Amino acid sequence: MASLYFTYSAMNAGKSTSLLQVAHNYEERQQHVLLMTPALDDRAGKGRIASRLGIGRDAVSFTHRTDLAAVVRARYMQQAIDCVLIDEAQFLSEEQVWQLSSLADTDNIPVMCYGIRTDAFGNAFPGSAVLLAIADKLVEMKTICHCGRKATMSLRVDEQGNAIRMGQQIAIGGNDRYVSCCRKHWKEAMGLR
């Protein structure tokens, strides 16, 4: 039986790079993958997954209303799919995570999701929370804080590098808006003890 995977980390750990490498590995063995990414993350262009290393690929774009299982099954009718790869999985709805689990459980298609656990305020994203609860396999990718400790948090900063302590859960951005840090330094920046 296929599995549902969730690879998670703080920002800037190389999740998209890893996803693109997995796609390459499947295709190198003449297997077919379906790459998917949320429409709201258009930093690399709509329907595109890109890494900070400069590599990228086109992907199927979806919204929080898209029935992901239906999309995958429709594409499977055109060509077999050996693996589904989801970038920015924190933006999945709870229902979409369950849809992806049905692809693994019913359709026997491995689904690999890549995303961050928590937002800039330390709260779990709904999609990440469900993935952490039901994924068959959890994989933590590691990156480091400026102090050298493992970074587990993503700090949102303004143009001057000051921590933003409140705001919308979702604010698309990269290295210019987010800094990965350990919990201790995240708490200090957020004014918490």
Swiss-Prot record:
Q: What class of enzyme is it?
A: transferase
Of the GO CC terms on this record, one is: cytosol
Asked whether the keyword Zinc is assigned, the reply is yes
A Pfam family it matches: TK
Protein name as catalogued:
Thymidine kinase
Q: Which Gene3D superfamilies match?
A: 3.30.60.20, P-loop containing nucleotide triphosphate hydrolases
Q: Which reaction does it catalyse?
A: thymidine + ATP = dTMP + ADP + H(+)
Q: Which UniProt keywords apply?
A: ATP-binding, Cytoplasm, DNA synthesis, Kinase, Metal-binding, Nucleotide-binding, Transferase, Zinc
Taxonomy, superkingdom: Bacteria
Q: Name one GO molecular function term.
A: ATP binding
* Positions of ATP binding: S9, A10, M11, N12, A13, G14, K15, S16, D87, E88, A89, Q90
Q: What is its EC number?
A: 2.7.1.21
Family statement drawn from the similarity comment of this UniProt entry: Belongs to the thymidine kinase family.
Q: Which organism is it from?
A: Idiomarina loihiensis (strain ATCC BAA-735 / DSM 15497 / L2-TR)
Residues that bind Zn(2+): C145, C147, C182, H185
A single GO BP annotation from the record? thymidine metabolic process
Q: How does it assemble?
A: Homotetramer.
Q: What is this protein's gene name?
A: tdk
Q: Where is the active site?
A: E88
Q: Where in the cell is it found?
A: Cytoplasm
